[in-house]
Amino acid sequence: MSFISKIRCAFTLGQGVLIENEALKETNDPILFFNNWLKKAQDTGIILPESMSISTCTPEGRPSSRMVLLKEVDSKGFVFFTNYDSRKAHDLEANPFAALLFHWNILQRQVRIEGRVERISTAQSNAYFQSRGRGSRIGAWASHQSQELNDRQTLVERVKYFEEKFAGKEIPLPEFWGGYRVIPESIEFWQGKADRLHDRFVYQPTEKNWTVKRLNP
């Protein structure tokens, strides 16, 4: 960590969450809260601040985690994209719940989201897919994600095959690729403090708004 980053980290540790529990009301919007923190992470220069860990479980309760990129967030939830034949997709089809974790170390902040997961529409998936670079779209077709690969050359040859197949053409959305939305059932914000008496707030949805509670560190 650079000297400037250390100063920034020390300063942030002393801040804590800049709101008190008494000021938090059910109408407070944790999505807005999240977007403010994400923008701060972007402005700080953190590389890929939209990266997040997603944890899934098999029906037998065996967890697995991996890093993915957040591609959209709104009042409905948090959206990411993947191959529907991947391990995480198989987990989600059988056990449609997940936990997300954002960790912005320099800011000493993290956000945890837990919730139910659903596929987004094919139209939404296609809109994002067509916005990707051509190489990424070819890669989506070429990769049998999470399946055993004999050697890298096999993958290279599949890429070449699809480059030739789609040469001069639009690349369609594969049936096995698309997005998921994590619909939050809880959103927890954590702000590190130098004395280790960290600030923690957890939001949970009600029928119309959100409840919010402060948690012990």
Swiss-Prot record:
The name under which this protein is listed is Pyridoxine/pyridoxamine 5'-phosphate oxidase
Q: What EC designation does it have?
A: 1.4.3.5
Biological-process GO terms, alphabetical: pyridoxine biosynthetic process
Gene field = pdxH
Required co-factors:
FMN
Catalysed transformations (reactions): pyridoxamine 5'-phosphate + O2 + H2O = pyridoxal 5'-phosphate + H2O2 + NH4(+); pyridoxine 5'-phosphate + O2 = pyridoxal 5'-phosphate + H2O2
Q: Is Flavoprotein set as a keyword in this record?
A: yes
Residues annotated as signal peptide:
none
Q: Which organism is it from?
A: Psychromonas ingrahamii (strain DSM 17664 / CCUG 51855 / 37)
The protein's assembly and partners: Homodimer.
Enumerate the residues binding substrate: 71, 128, 132, 136, 196-198
Pathway assignment reads: Cofactor metabolism; pyridoxal 5'-phosphate salvage; pyridoxal 5'-phosphate from pyridoxamine 5'-phosphate: step 1/1; Cofactor metabolism; pyridoxal 5'-phosphate salvage; pyridoxal 5'-phosphate from pyridoxine 5'-phosphate: step 1/1
Residues reported in the UniProt entry to bind FMN = 66-71, 81-82, 87-88, 110, 145-146, 190, 200
GO MF entries? FMN binding; pyridoxamine phosphate oxidase activity
According to its UniProt record, which protein family does this protein belong to? Belongs to the pyridoxamine 5'-phosphate oxidase family.
Keywords (A to Z) from UniProt: Flavoprotein, FMN, Oxidoreductase, Pyridoxine biosynthesis
A Pfam family assignment: PNPOx_N
User: Cofactor stoichiometry and binding?
Assistant: Binds 1 FMN per subunit.
Entry function: Catalyzes the oxidation of either pyridoxine 5'-phosphate (PNP) or pyridoxamine 5'-phosphate (PMP) into pyridoxal 5'-phosphate (PLP).
